[in-house]
UniProtKB/Swiss-Prot annotation:
Keyword Lyase listed: no
Organism per entry: Renibacterium salmoninarum (strain ATCC 33209 / DSM 20767 / JCM 11484 / NBRC 15589 / NCIMB 2235)
Name listed for the protein in its UniProt record: Elongation factor G
Keyword match GTP-binding: yes
InterPro entries for the chain: EFG_II, EFG_III, EFG_III/V, EFG_IV, EFG_V, EFG_V-like, EFTu-like_2, G_TR_CS
One Pfam family matching this protein: GTP_EFTU_D2
GO BP field: ribosome disassembly
Subcellular location: Cytoplasm
Binding site for GTP: 19-26, 83-87, 137-140
GO molecular function: GTP binding; GTPase activity; translation elongation factor activity
Gene expressing this chain: fusA
PANTHER family xref list: RIBOSOME-RELEASING FACTOR 2, MITOCHONDRIAL (PTHR43261:SF1), TRANSLATION ELONGATION FACTOR G-RELATED (PTHR43261)
Biased composition (Basic and acidic residues): 298-313
Family: Belongs to the TRAFAC class translation factor GTPase superfamily. Classic translation factor GTPase family. EF-G/EF-2 subfamily.
Amino acid sequence: MAQDVLTDLNKVRNIGIMAHIDAGKTTTTERILFYTGVNHKIGETHDGASTTDWMEQEKERGITITSAAVTSFWNGNQINIIDTPGHVDFTVEVERSLRVLDGAVAVFDGKEGVEPQSETVWRQADKYEVPRICFVNKMDKLGADFYFTVDTIINRLGAKPLVIQLPIGAENDFVGVVDLLEMRALVWPGDSKGDVTMGAKYEVQEIPADLLEKAQEYRAALVEAAAEASEELMEKYLEGEELTVAELKAGIRKLTIASEIYPVLCGSAFKNRGVQPMLDAVVDFLPSPLDVPPMIGHDPRNEETEMTRKPSTDEPFSALAFKVATHPFFGQLVFIRVYSGQIASGTQVINSTKGKKERIGKLFQMHANKENPVEEALAGHIYAAIGLKDTTTGDTLADITNPIVLESMSFPEPVISVAIEPKTKGDQEKLSTAIQKLSAEDPTFRVNLDEDTGQTIIAGMGELHLDILVDRMRREFRVEANVGKPQVAYRETIRRKVEKHDYTHKKQTGGSGQFAKIQIAIEPFTSEEGVLYEFENKVTGGRVPREYIPSVDQGIQSALTDGVLAGYPVVGIKATLLDGAYHDVDSSEMAFKIAGRMAFKEAARKADPVLLEPLMEVEVRTPEEYMGDVIGDLNSRRGQMQSMEDASGVKVIRSLVPLSGMFGYIGDLRSKTQGRAVYSMQFDSYAEVPKAVSDEIIQKARGE
């Protein structure tokens, strides 16, 4: 049975489940696994027993950190699900899972509507053009309002929702949904307490009389929207003919795959209502690997040559590694999405990103943290592979005789760091193992050595991110270490162009000396793609031999790691090599590298250097009576108010606040609002630090 499904890609769906931190995403995934027969006992996040949350910290904190890939079957279709974390510190996990998905289910909290993190994840899905259906969850919750949530999809996301279900009853009285396609009511009858037993089937009933008019109105809108999918449907619709359910589904599917509309369903995953129709919608409306455009990549031997791979087993093998995880028995597991061709376990492939040959040891289809071994990996599917030594997130694996490099993923720079000091020499060794493994798993986790203090500095996307990384070092790698206070990842840049700056590096110490002379220009530089540095060579007439030019570039880049103001990394620089001179005997790559480094340091001092700090977009939801205190407090943290609006009985305040002002904010907010306000924050951009604050940071960094 499973094998038949695997080869017919029309019946395969690779989907993600994406949402705000508490919209009930993991519970929804759990229910899907239950209904598709994979789990016999249901796991609840709040009991710490859910299948996809399998790391110890996830179970303790009740949040999903790593996206587990799980395979399940529904009515003869195969659904591969990636559960993505909703917490903003784990953006990298969301980014990389969206990159390999074909479609997604966006889960919203029926009371809160679109929350800040739902907005972030939605924008990421837009970036990768992932078609979505929406599931308005928690319809049994006090204050749940389906129609308000649909409005927030329009107003906050600027998206075009297409309602294909209406809720029957709300809060405690929520019993089922109206299926607008078939115009019928689906009701999950409860027991004496109103609870639905796990796996209970729904009953098909007549639409309740009080909802009939509303259902007809929404169905008319649905038919009109579906008719826009093709000229034939439009013609039929305009001539007043009835469109069949199959035609409506085909129209909605076409528009969903084109990301023109987003079908909206509703339910309560926790109360087991609405999950089966949502699975039907995944199959009906989300794309199969065959509906997605062919993958584009380039020839590893020549970046200019564009190549494509269709999702077929007849094409040469190509796959993208989108996640690395450490497994207790197998060591390193690499999750791959196979885009074309097929590969048997034990075969040699090439990591075309790094130009290294790799052997695929064993292949598995994953079930959260249970493995199901398979003999071969086929196009259109997601697998975990063991035995890959040099492959990290974003690398392409390809057929040795016909390699391709697929488009990789871009990850944000970390904004916060802590110093970590191992307690003993033995811990130092364990720490380096831990760092090596964790940075292979997580591209947003960075490590560097502070040369002045000898401390190891680890950097990440937020306090929770670093907490969990440190926690994993202690638990998984048994590292005993002292961890410093979180520090802000400041940056440095320049404001002014320096037209030309000369530097000569000369050293005479008996025998051959060192000589390099260069003239450089530096200027502020910004790029759309987030590139932080650019080097241009304008030397003519061989005044600097070609083999030394990369050394100048390397020297300048080495100077960018510690800026002239306070030793922070330098960004937003364009450097141009204008002229130079060399000596036949005394010039060397080393001499030009030193010249590049020193020339940049001197030029940067003349280029009006400034400090940059990360600004966070902070959103606070507070009852009105505390609004004044909350705003006053944000202002005292150098916050800049962006907007204020009302949402379901609370005030929503949006402000841009420097990260340095946000440490420990949660405690202060709780005490100011008696624990009634909640906030979320995410990185927005880097901005110049005001002079008074900047002077203080520089003095501290220089130890004055």
